[in-house]
Swiss-Prot record:
It comes from Kribbella flavida (strain DSM 17836 / JCM 10339 / NBRC 14399). Mg(2+) binds at residues 9, 55, 63. Catalyzes the covalent attachment of the prokaryotic ubiquitin-like protein modifier Pup to the proteasomal substrate proteins, thereby targeting them for proteasomal degradation. This tagging system is termed pupylation. The ligation reaction involves the side-chain carboxylate of the C-terminal glutamate of Pup and the side-chain amino group of a substrate lysine. Pfam families: Pup_ligase. The reaction mechanism probably proceeds via the activation of Pup by phosphorylation of its C-terminal glutamate, which is then subject to nucleophilic attack by the substrate lysine, resulting in an isopeptide bond and the release of phosphate as a good leaving group. It comes from the Bacteria. Pathway: Protein degradation; proteasomal Pup-dependent pathway; Protein modification; protein pupylation. This is Pup--protein ligase. GO terms for biological process: modification-dependent protein catabolic process; proteasomal protein catabolic process; protein pupylation. NCBIfam families: pupylate_PafA. The lineage of its organism: Bacteria, Bacillati, Actinomycetota, Actinomycetes, Propionibacteriales. The active site is at 57 (proton acceptor). InterPro entries: Pup_ligase, Pup_ligase/deamidase. Its EC number is 6.3.1.19.
Length: 453
């Protein structure tokens, strides 16, 4: 599939503290956060003018799901627009609390674990053809996804019985199965629940829930573009070396605890291979595939270059070449500088605070955004593109139809209902348009429905 639909869903951690103590429960904070949403959407589960979905997920986690994107750069702009929309809700909630005499700071974290050991996710969606062998797809993908944390993990200081360690992935500790239809109870690598949100005879939606939420735009680019390339190779029938892991769940943890990428994990055929070996194999196949088929767009070439530089940097032990581009490395270097300046151990509560502050999406306060202001991290999209994505849907997919419909209905004060595939006017005629093709950005039926308002 040379043109693919992508989507990202990010759940955010939420808290409110006053002088270091928790002031409100997450439920209470979430209610304040979503009060403005409920006032205009009459619900805490809404679709927005930019085609995205914003809702309160299980456990009081605000979740933002981007509209359908058919380019990785569009996807990054829309994921970052979600951060900005939630930051707006945070500022509004903070003001409401102060107006009501409740003093404290509201925080939204784009991370994957809280201090109580709970995990919440970043889910990636990739549209695939219904006609492929889904089980085979999963088999080839799992070794890639288990080792992918080495190139796009968000990093975390993990407290273990043997002391604190720096782990490359936040999510790795919370994955319990390879392939499953559950997302919360068992937390698989790939979720198989068959909800294509498209024509079920033609498409299937691959739902990957193993990845970390990324602050870094370049890490996000590498995460999605590399996965897309592996999918394209599988779809094209490229023969891959059998890298099936003997125990993917043990392997994901072992790899997460090893920043060098050299720790060997057992393969099903009895051999052993390191995360560097496995990622190197996928990279070499992808490079060859892109060159032979002349698929080298600027985004693909940028991702391949970063993939190669990241593996080389990890192999050499000199991370300076990727300290602006890969989340876990950016954060690790930040923590190491802070520890050296203040003579702190890795288990210090001040280090844990720094670890968390990296993911704070409130730009005047969050450490990632402090680095961005200093020009210490590399960007993929600029602020203007992110600002536009807050209100303008992707223009080349079904998200455009949804966004235009919502915009007109709100302007005309019409009652409506939408989901990923349906657009419905709640009038006497109950007119509904079913949009089964996520690639289709223009549809006469939708134009007519919009014109009739």
């Amino acid at each position: 599939m040379n043109r693919r639909i992508f989507g990202l869903e990010n759940e955010y951690g939420v808290t409110c503290t006053f002088r270091g103590q928790r002031r409100l429960t997450p439920d209470e904070v979430a209610r304040y956060l979503f009060r403005r949403v409920v006032s205009w959407g009459r619900s805490s589960n809404v679709f927005l003018r930019n085609g995205a979905r914003l809702y309160l997920d299980v456990g009081s986690h605000p979740e933002y799901a981007t509209g359908e994107c058919d380019s990785v750069t569009d996807l990054i702009a829309h994921d970052k627009a979600g951060e900005r929309i939630l930051e707006g809700l945070l500022v509004d909630a903070q003001k409401r609390l102060h107006d009501e005499g409740i003093f404290g700071d509201v925080y939204l974290f784009k991370n994957n674990t809280d201090s109580a050991g709970n995990s919440y996710g970043c889910h990636e969606n990739y549209l695939v053809s219904r006609h492929g062998d889904f089980a085979k797809l999963a088999d080839v993908l799992i070794p890639f996804l288990v080792t992918r944390q080495l190139i796009c993990g968000a990093g975390k200081v993990l407290q273990t019985p043997r002391g604190a360690v720096y782990s490359v992935s936040q999510r790795a500790e919370h994955i319990w199965e390879g392939v499953s239809s559950a997302t919360t109870r068992s937390r698989p690598i790939i979720n198989t629940r068959d909800e294509p949100h498209a024509d079920a005879e033609r498409f299937r939606r691959l739902h990957v829930i193993v990845g970390d939420s990324n602050m870094s735009e370049t890490t996000m680019l590498l995460k999605v573009a590399s996965t897309d390339l592996v999918l394209r190779m599988i779809e094209a029938g490229i023969v891959m070396r059998d890298l099936t892991l003997d125990n993917p769940i043990r392997a994901i943890r072992e790899i997460s605890h090893d920043m060098t990428g050299r720790r060997e994990v057992r393969l099903a055929n009895g051999r052993e291979a390191s995360a560097l070996d496995i990622q190197g194999e996928y990279l070499s196949k992808a490079r060859d595939f892109v060159d032979r088929r002349e698929l080298g767009t600027p985004a693909v070439e940028r991702a391949l270059s970063l993939w190669e530089r990241t593996l080389k940097a990890i192999e050499s032990g000199d991370l300076s070449g990727i300290e602006r581009e890969i989340d876990w490395v950016i954060k690790y270097r930040l923590i190491e500088r802070y520890r050296a300046q203040n003579n702190l151990g890795l288990a210090s509560p001040r280090v844990a605070q720094l670890d968390l502050a990296y993911h704070d999406i409130h730009r005047p306060r969050g450490l990632y955004y402090l680095l961005e202001r200093k020009g210490a991290v590399t960007r993929v999209v600029d602020d203007l593109r992110v600002f536009e994505a807050k209100s303008v849907p992707p223009q080349t997919t079904r998200a455009r139809l949804r966004g235009e419909f919502i915009k007109r209905a709100q302007e005309r004060r019409r009652d409506f209902t939408v989901d990923w595939v349906h657009l419905k006017l709640n009038d006497q005629a109950q007119r509904t348009v079913l949009c089964k093709d996520p690639f289709k950005s223009h549809d006469e039926r939708v134009e007519k429905l919009i014109a009739s308002m």
